[in-house]
Protein backbone atom coordinates (compact mmCIF):
# COMPACT_ATOMS: atom_id res chain seq x y z
CA UNK A 1 0.00 0.00 0.00
CA UNK A 2 1.54 3.36 -1.02
CA UNK A 3 2.16 6.01 1.60
CA UNK A 4 0.14 9.21 1.33
CA UNK A 5 2.17 12.22 0.28
CA UNK A 6 3.14 14.81 2.88
CA UNK A 7 0.71 17.35 1.44
CA UNK A 8 -2.32 15.06 1.45
CA UNK A 9 -3.47 15.96 4.98
CA UNK A 10 -6.30 18.29 4.07
CA UNK A 11 -9.42 19.29 5.89
CA UNK A 12 -11.81 19.71 2.92
CA UNK A 13 -13.43 22.68 4.70
CA UNK A 14 -13.08 26.37 3.95
CA UNK A 15 -14.10 29.43 5.95
CA UNK A 16 -15.60 31.00 2.80
CA UNK A 17 -18.00 29.69 0.19
CA UNK A 18 -19.24 30.61 -3.27
CA UNK A 19 -20.97 33.99 -3.32
CA UNK A 20 -19.19 35.42 -0.25
CA UNK A 21 -17.55 38.83 -0.48
CA UNK A 22 -13.91 38.55 0.58
CA UNK A 23 -10.86 40.79 0.90
CA UNK A 24 -7.31 39.72 0.00
CA UNK A 25 -4.97 39.95 3.01
CA UNK A 26 -1.55 39.13 1.51
CA UNK A 27 0.38 39.34 -1.74
CA UNK A 28 0.32 41.75 -4.65
CA UNK A 29 -3.50 41.89 -4.61
CA UNK A 30 -3.65 42.89 -0.93
CA UNK A 31 -6.68 45.05 -0.15
CA UNK A 32 -8.72 44.06 -3.21
CA UNK A 33 -12.24 42.80 -2.62
CA UNK A 34 -14.44 40.57 -4.73
CA UNK A 35 -17.02 37.84 -4.75
CA UNK A 36 -15.96 34.19 -4.50
CA UNK A 37 -16.71 32.60 -7.89
CA UNK A 38 -15.40 29.13 -7.06
CA UNK A 39 -14.29 27.38 -3.88
CA UNK A 40 -11.84 24.48 -4.16
CA UNK A 41 -11.79 22.89 -0.69
CA UNK A 42 -9.54 19.93 -1.62
CA UNK A 43 -6.83 22.36 -2.74
CA UNK A 44 -7.70 24.99 -0.06
CA UNK A 45 -8.05 27.60 -2.82
CA UNK A 46 -10.66 30.11 -3.96
CA UNK A 47 -11.24 32.02 -7.19
CA UNK A 48 -12.19 35.65 -6.52
CA UNK A 49 -13.90 37.86 -9.11
CA UNK A 50 -11.52 40.45 -10.59
CA UNK A 51 -8.54 39.37 -8.45
CA UNK A 52 -5.34 37.56 -9.52
CA UNK A 53 -5.97 37.93 -13.25
CA UNK A 54 -3.70 35.90 -15.52
CA UNK A 55 -3.25 36.02 -19.29
CA UNK A 56 -4.36 32.82 -21.00
CA UNK A 57 -3.57 31.97 -24.62
CA UNK A 58 -6.61 30.22 -26.11
CA UNK A 59 -6.33 28.05 -29.21
CA UNK A 60 -9.07 28.37 -31.84
CA UNK A 61 -11.89 25.87 -31.33
CA UNK A 62 -15.47 25.29 -32.43
CA UNK A 63 -16.75 27.36 -29.50
CA UNK A 64 -14.15 30.10 -30.05
CA UNK A 65 -13.06 30.08 -33.75
CA UNK A 66 -10.98 33.25 -33.33
CA UNK A 67 -8.86 32.03 -30.41
CA UNK A 68 -6.62 34.71 -28.93
CA UNK A 69 -5.50 35.98 -25.56
CA UNK A 70 -7.90 36.43 -22.66
CA UNK A 71 -7.71 37.39 -19.00
CA UNK A 72 -8.99 34.97 -16.37
CA UNK A 73 -9.08 34.81 -12.59
CA UNK A 74 -6.60 32.34 -11.11
CA UNK A 75 -7.02 30.63 -7.75
CA UNK A 76 -5.69 32.11 -4.51
CA UNK A 77 -4.91 30.15 -1.36
CA UNK A 78 -7.85 30.37 1.04
CA UNK A 79 -5.58 31.52 3.90
CA UNK A 80 -4.87 34.72 1.95
CA UNK A 81 -8.51 35.90 2.01
CA UNK A 82 -10.90 36.90 4.78
CA UNK A 83 -14.64 37.37 4.76
CA UNK A 84 -15.82 40.99 4.68
CA UNK A 85 -17.94 41.85 7.74
CA UNK A 86 -21.39 42.90 6.44
CA UNK A 87 -21.69 45.55 9.16
CA UNK A 88 -18.25 47.21 9.15
CA UNK A 89 -16.91 46.32 5.68
CA UNK A 90 -13.63 45.16 7.25
CA UNK A 91 -12.08 41.68 7.24
CA UNK A 92 -13.31 39.31 9.94
CA UNK A 93 -12.94 35.73 11.06
CA UNK A 94 -15.96 33.44 11.12
CA UNK A 95 -17.46 31.50 14.00
CA UNK A 96 -20.20 28.87 13.79
CA UNK A 97 -23.22 29.28 16.06
CA UNK A 98 -26.66 27.75 16.43
CA UNK A 99 -29.44 30.31 15.97
CA UNK A 100 -33.07 29.13 16.11
CA UNK A 101 -31.89 25.52 15.89
CA UNK A 102 -29.94 26.21 12.70
CA UNK A 103 -26.14 26.27 12.34
CA UNK A 104 -25.05 29.63 10.90
CA UNK A 105 -21.84 31.56 10.34
CA UNK A 106 -21.29 34.60 12.55
CA UNK A 107 -18.78 37.42 12.05
CA UNK A 108 -16.38 37.40 15.02
CA UNK A 109 -15.83 41.18 15.11
CA UNK A 110 -19.45 42.38 14.94
CA UNK A 111 -21.41 39.27 15.96
CA UNK A 112 -23.61 39.69 12.88
CA UNK A 113 -25.10 36.54 11.31
CA UNK A 114 -23.71 36.03 7.80
CA UNK A 115 -26.03 33.29 6.55
UniProtKB/Swiss-Prot annotation:
Keywords: Ribonucleoprotein, Ribosomal protein, RNA-binding, rRNA-binding. GO terms for molecular function: rRNA binding; structural constituent of ribosome. PROSITE patterns: RIBOSOMAL_L24. GO terms for biological process: translation. One of its GO terms (cellular component) is ribonucleoprotein complex. The keyword ATP-binding does not apply. Part of the 50S ribosomal subunit. Belongs to the universal ribosomal protein uL24 family. One of two assembly initiator proteins, it binds directly to the 5'-end of the 23S rRNA, where it nucleates assembly of the 50S subunit. One of the proteins that surrounds the polypeptide exit tunnel on the outside of the subunit. This is Large ribosomal subunit protein uL24. It comes from Deinococcus geothermalis (strain DSM 11300 / CIP 105573 / AG-3a).
